[in-house]
């Protein structure tokens, strides 16, 4: 019996990138909509899933020629995220109030002095910043656009709050199912 070597093609590479890219949004939604058994386990899973997602995006972004304007916007978004997370602390960054029952705490230090949702704005800037790079955008615009759309979805979820869990469960489920469908189509359609 002969064993044929499997050489992954560009289409299966793209499908893999898309399928690795969105799991952290699912974890956020599930925790927000249904709660968690262990906050520590949720945080670890969320960090691992987001790390895989960002690594997948970085792999394809770094294959494109350097675009300094794009890199500047990405860096600004990441710096906004880092500053916001540092101000909130690790537990509150991962829905500590909503999921783990940490007491409500109003934060008025930059960047929260300017906006209530700087991490989402930082994510939108960073993911949107990739689209400034023409070469990246030509092939991977659905990937970055889905990230931007899902971050806006997270904002809607956060604004709805835990008091509207049924709406969050239904709406989030529909959005995530649509995202999975769109990711598979985009991954299969990439040549």
What are these regions (language model features)?
Residues 1-112, 121-191:
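Membrane-anchoring alpha-helices and their flanking helix-loop junctions
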């Amino acid at each position: 019996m002969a064993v044929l070597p499997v050489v992954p093609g560009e289409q299966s590479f793209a499908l893999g990138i898309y399928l690795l890219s969105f799991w952290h949004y699912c974890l956020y939604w599930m925790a927000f909509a249904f709660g968690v058994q262990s906050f520590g386990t949720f945080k670890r899973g969320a960090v691992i899933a987001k790390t895989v997602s960002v690594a997948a995006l970085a792999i394809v972004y770094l294959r494109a020629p350097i675009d300094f304007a794009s890199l500047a916007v990405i860096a600004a978004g990441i710096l906004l995220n880092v500053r916001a997370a540092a101000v909130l602390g690790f537990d509150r960054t991962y829905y500590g109030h909503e999921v783990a029952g940490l007491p409500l705490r109003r934060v008025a230090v930059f960047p929260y002095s300017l906006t209530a949702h700087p991490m989402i704005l930082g994510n939108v800037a960073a993911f949107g910043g990739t689209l400034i790079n023409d070469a990246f955008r030509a092939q991977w615009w659905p990937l970055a656009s889905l990230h931007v759309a899902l971050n806006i979805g997270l904002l809607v979820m956060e604004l709805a709050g835990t008091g509207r869990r049924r709406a969050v469960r239904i709406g989030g489920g529909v959005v995530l199912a649509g995202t999975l469908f769109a990711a598979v189509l985009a991954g299969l359609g990439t040549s």
